[in-house]
């Protein structure tokens, strides 16, 4: 990458700026520019897209996104220590990188970017699931075209899990209802500085123009929350507070009242949400 953007290797960057990953911010720096370039490529053709990156740290993935031709990158970084390193990246790519020192949970991203928009990020471990849930719960179709996101491997496996598995739950349902998520890369702990105790994985989410099955989002969210908060209980017990005769409603949706949440596919939960909605 240095031959492309003229910037030094990332280990030199963090040494020059005295950067070390902060555990309380969920940081783990990915310093291999070959890997950051690979993640940028996995996001697809960026040449006509604006890109949102959350938690760029010293700018390794940022450099990959710019080198892959992203029209413009908005990098939101909460840690002010990283700003000088990111300013150097911005100087190497004039007019194409905006760095915002802010909490990504508090930024109206859609107002700052021009469609088409892709989100590509090595998400801080402590906010990754919350950010994903927000992006998947917005009005549909959303402001973004695709998501290419790094998570702890355990979280990535929950996203792509199928019914009947221990990993299957609300995150799988929310992800698979309106996107096609796939694990596209797995990374060992020693790819990061400092090495985390777990493996990481990159998930690419392809947006669907409409949900796989019709359902009211709020009703579906309520049903799945109640079902999976007591996932080992039979649905006639975990959902008994929804309506007076939950067993009848379950059967009308094609679900046996003695089944448990982890046995019910997405289509079944959507059918149940439709019955409850009216």
Swiss-Prot record:
InterPro entries with a match to the protein in the record: KsgA/Erm (IPR001737), rRNA_Ade_diMease-like_C (IPR023165), rRNA_Ade_Mease_Trfase_CS (IPR020596), rRNA_Ade_methylase_Trfase_N (IPR020598), rRNA_adenine_dimethylase (IPR011530), SAM-dependent_MTases_sf (IPR029063)
Domain of life the protein comes from: Bacteria
CDD domains per the UniProt record, alphabetical: AdoMet_MTases
Primary residence: cytoplasm
Gene3D superfamilies found in the cross-reference section: Ribosomal RNA adenine dimethylase-like, domain 2 (1.10.8.100), Vaccinia Virus protein VP39 (3.40.50.150)
Keyword Chaperone among record annotations: no
Family: Belongs to the class I-like SAM-binding methyltransferase superfamily. rRNA adenine N(6)-methyltransferase family. RsmA subfamily.
Annotated protein name in UniProt: Ribosomal RNA small subunit methyltransferase A
């Amino acid at each position: 990458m240095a031959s492309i953007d003229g910037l030094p290797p990332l280990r030199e960057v963090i040494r020059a700026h005295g950067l070390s990953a902060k555990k309380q911010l969920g940081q783990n720096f990915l310093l291999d520019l070959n890997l950051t370039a690979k993640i940028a490529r996995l996001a697809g053709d960026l040449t006509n897209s604006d890109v949102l990156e959350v938690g760029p740290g010293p700018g390794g993935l940022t450099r990959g996104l710019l080198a892959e031709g992203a029209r413009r990158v908005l990098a939101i970084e909460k840690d002010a220590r990283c700003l000088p390193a990111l300013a150097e990246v911005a100087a190497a790519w004039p007019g194409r990188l905006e760095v915002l020192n802010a909490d990504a949970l508090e930024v109206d991203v859609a107002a700052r970017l021009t469609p088409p928009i892709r989100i590509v990020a090595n998400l801080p471990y402590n906010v990754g699931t919350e950010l994903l849930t927000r992006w998947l719960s917005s009005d549909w179709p959303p402001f973004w075209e695709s998501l290419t996101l790094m998570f702890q491997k355990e979280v990535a496996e929950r996203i792509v899990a199928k019914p009947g598995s221990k990993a299957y739950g609300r995150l799988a349902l929310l992800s698979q209802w309106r996107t096609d998520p796939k694990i596209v890369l797995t990374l060992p702990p020693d790819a990061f500085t400092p090495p985390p105790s777990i493996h990481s994985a990159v998930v690419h989410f392809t947006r669907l123009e409409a949900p796989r099955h019709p359902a009211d989002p709020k009703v579906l969210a309520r049903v799945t929350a109640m079902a999976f908060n007591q996932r080992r209980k039979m649905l006639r017990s975990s959902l008994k507070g929804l309506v007076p005769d939950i067993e009848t409603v379950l059967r009308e949706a094609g679900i046996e009242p003695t089944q448990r949440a982890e046995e019910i596919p997405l289509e079944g939960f959507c059918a149940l949400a439709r019955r409850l909605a009216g």
